[in-house]
């Protein structure tokens, strides 16, 4: 097992688990919630995070970050079960790819379009993307008057 999996993967697992717990308290109808203004629906926010995860997962395979992927599956952002299944697949694929890296592979660089960073740093930035998503989602949950799980209060605020 590589150093990242031993020392840091728990952060990714933890952020994925927080997202899973959020989806567990939502209904399909909740995904249509929009707090107003130029914001997207909660379901669209979840779909967007999945597209971001897809970009990061693919970058671990191609060593290039490509942000253009859009999941066009009809009804994805209106179905909690579809989102759960998609995230489960994305999470598993990313973990399998990361587990296959050697410690030396963690130093390989990933082109992010104008600059590059090591695989290990790319994974750290992915954790930050997850935390940003969870912060956004917490605003939606608060606007919906949903209680935040205890770990959200500790990690996100």
Language-model segments: residues:
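Short, contiguous alpha-helical
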Residues: 5, 9-13, 17-23, 28-71, ...
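Acidic/histidine-rich alpha-helical segments that form the ligand environment
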Residues: 75-111, 117-139
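Serine/threonine-rich low-complexity intrinsically disordered regions
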Residues: 2, 71, 77-78, 102, ...
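Active-site rim elements
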Residues: 2-9, 79-81
């Amino acid at each position: 097992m590589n150093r990242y999996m031993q020392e840091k993967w728990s952060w990714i697992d933890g952020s994925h688990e927080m997202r899973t717990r959020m989806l567990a308290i939502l209904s399909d109808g909740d995904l249509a919630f929009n707090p107003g203004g130029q914001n997207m629906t909660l379901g669209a926010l979840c779909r967007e995070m999945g597209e971001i995860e897809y970009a990061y997962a693919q970058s671990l395979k191609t060593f290039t970050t490509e942000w253009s992927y859009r999941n066009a599956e009809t009804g994805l952002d209106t179905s909690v079960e579809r989102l759960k299944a998609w995230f489960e697949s994305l999470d598993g694929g990313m973990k399998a790819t990361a587990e296959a890296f050697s410690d030396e592979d963690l130093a390989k660089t990933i082109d992010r379009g104008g600059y590059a960073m090591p695989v290990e740093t790319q994974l750290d930035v992915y954790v930050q993307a997850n935390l940003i998503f969870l912060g956004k989602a917490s605003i939606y949950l608060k606007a919906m008057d949903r209680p935040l799980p205890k770990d959200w209060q500790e990690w996100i605020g």
